[in-house]
Amino acid sequence: MKKTKTVLILAAVTGVLFLGGCGSEKTKIYEQAGKDLSQGSYKYALEEYQSSIQNGVKLAQSYRGAGIASLRLGKYEDAVNSFTEALNCDKVSKSLCKDILSYRATAELKSGKYEDAMADCQTLGEDFSMDAGSYFLTGKVALAMDSYEEAASNFKQAYGEDSTYDMAIEIYEAYLDKDMEADGTRYLEAALSSEAKDAQDHCDRGRVYYYMEDYSNAKKELLEATKKDNTEALLLLGMVYLAQDDVENAQAMYKQYISAVGDSAKGYNGLALCDIRSGDYDSALDNITKGLPTAATDEMQSLLFNEIVAYEKKLDFATALTKVQEYIEMFPEDSAAKKERAFLKTRTSSEG
């Protein structure tokens, strides 16, 4: 009897250890997903969050993580669905609900569902305290819907809450995308009204001057930033030199940037742009290939678009058409790519 009881206890302990180990593995998968998401490894993060969902680990957070990974991968419909599932989970805190709603509105905006995006923005305004990010997002959605006064009002609120170089540039880029550059330029001018206090300020001011096409002042600010080992300034200097058709100095800056930070999608994309400008299309394709493994979604989008351009410049219209069709599947909202596809179809049909 005593022996039987001992066996049962051992079995029970073993079972607890086994279950504990299983739970530990599930937790590790969830934690690894968070690490991969923060490091830009979105494909792996998505797979791991999907496993966490199947395992029932922190469902709201796992659906949120899967949504963010899908968003970064350009899978906007999947992202919206994941965020909706997250919101439908039990015991979602108010702060998490606000966060997920913001992400869902962003995914809806990206997928062209402007009415849905605005509905989520209105919920943010009605049920939560608005911050700079909320105002900016609402402004972007309003701008996409051609509600210019509403957009202007929200952008003004956003900049009032967060009067930084980054916010000024984000608002400028939002207007630039709608061919309303003048409306955005005043935010750049406002950002330049303060003095630079450190290397990052000089870098940010250089970036603002770059957007304003004031390349002389951009170089002045960026060179000041590089004296204090600001690596971002090297990347921006490459952009400034390239804008001035100084390909040699642009290449030098991009190479220096890669040397400083290691393999970089932005650095290789810069080199590819230099190659395209100088007519070395094979080198451009080589640099694009080097940049893709470390690319986040926006960086990948730029690299893949430049890949299309390189094949077109090589007069390899068939490959360019294949590439642009693959690109549009990943980034369906890119109108420039759709125009490029229409052009390439005329060239490939004329070749046939």
What are these regions (language model features)?
Residues 57, 91, 95, 128-130, ...:
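Short coil turns that delineate tetratricopeptide repeat
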Residues 27-28, 61, 95-99, 133, ...:
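Start-of-helix register in tetratricopeptide repeats
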Residues 38-39, 72-73, 110, 144-145, ...:
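Register position in tetratricopeptide repeats
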Residues 65, 72, 96-103, 137, ...:
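Canonical tetratricopeptide repeat
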